[in-house]
A protein has these predicted regions:
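Glycine-rich ThDP/TPP pyrophosphate-binding loop and its adjacent helix/strand module
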Residues: 82-173, 177
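Thiamine diphosphate
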Residues: 3-85, 92-98, 140-141
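Structured core elements
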Residues: 3-5, 47-49, 75-77, 113-114, ...
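Short, ordered loop/turn segments at secondary-structure junctions
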Residues: 9, 78-81, 117-120, 159-160, ...
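Gly-rich Lys/Arg/Thr-decorated short loops/hinges at beta-loop-alpha junctions or inter-strand turns
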Residues: 11-20, 43-44, 80-88, 120-127, ...
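Iron-sulfur cluster-binding cysteine motifs and their immediate structural context
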Residues: 159-160, 165-171, 189-244
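N-terminal export/assembly segments and adjacent metallocofactor-ligating motifs
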Residues: 34-39, 45-46, 72, 82, ...
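Iron-sulfur-cluster electron-transfer modules
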Residues: 1-3, 9-22, 26-30, 218, ...
Length: 246
């Protein structure tokens, strides 16, 4: 299987999740460790995670070094529209996802693919003029293709930070779907597939007289709705529901 290297940012936590992610670097060194290892490794390709804040700081220099070395590496650049690790500030210089894509193309990256969340509002026609675009449900297929592509490739994953979504929705600055997901505890069997599919911290254990089930913490739910991809009939979708204020 494939492996990924970590870097500086929230995604560093993937190291602790037993998901074949290792090797954090200093800021701006993302992927450069692979440039030295590649000639002596039996592995042909790696992925490198890179946050948009680090990219804006010095990450592009590492990508340019990878292009110059002709390494087989795919940079997975998360554009979450915030310097999330330090409080959700805006990027210096108002960096945008389309600017990142344009810079990657100019730097000589062989193939750039934009991955997007279909629930977010942005000009998809504009992005399709810059690179190939695919919904996030196609991520695994795109990763498999890029892993077999020689040279430097990149995925720009465009999805706003979940914590920032909640903050902006409270101020009316971000689309707020009029829908909430609940779990019917009488149907739920506690298999946990919803958590496997969504990796969402809002799915909490619910102790019942029939054993442990699952419930959704509505106070932290960011309305991602990926939990409903779980193989389970217990989900209830409610339109117009609001959290009761104390």
């Amino acid at each position: 299987g494939s492996i990924a290297y970590a870097g500086i940012g929230c995604h560093t936590m993937a190291i602790w999740m037993d998901r074949a992610t290792d090797g954090p670097t200093h800021m701006g060194g993302e992927g450069v460790n692979w440039l030295g290892q590649a000639p002596f490794s039996n592995r042909n390709h790696v992925f490198q995670n890179l946050g948009d804040g680090t990219y804006n700081h010095s990450g592009l220099l590492a990508i340019r070094a990878a292009v110059a070395s002709s390494a087989n590496i795919t940079y997975k650049i998360l554009f979450n529209d915030a310097v999330a690790m330090t409080g959700g500030q805006s990027h210096e210089g108002e960096l945008s996802a389309d600017e990142i894509i344009t810079e990657l193309n100019s730097a000589g990256v062989k193939r750039v693919v934009g991955i997007f969340d279909e629930k977010e509002e942005f000009d998809l026609d504009h992005y399709r003029k810059l690179c190939e675009m695919a919904p996030r449900s196609e991520l695994m297929r795109i990763q498999e293709q890029l892993a077999s592509t020689s040279g430097v490739t990149a995925i720009v994953y465009i999805q706003t930070c979940a914590a920032e979504k909640r903050r902006r929705r409270k101020r009316g600055l971000f689309p707020d779907p009029d829908r909430r997901i609940f779990i019917n505890s009488e149907v739920c069997e506690g298999c946990g597939d919803c958590g496997v599919k969504s990796n969402c911290v809002s799915i909490r254990p619910a102790e019942t007289e029939l054993g442990r089930k699952r419930k959704i913490d509505q106070s932290s739910c960011n309305k991602d709705f990926s939990c409903v991809s779980g193989f389970c009939p217990s989900f209830v979708s409610v339109i117009g529901a609001e959290i009761k204020k104390k």
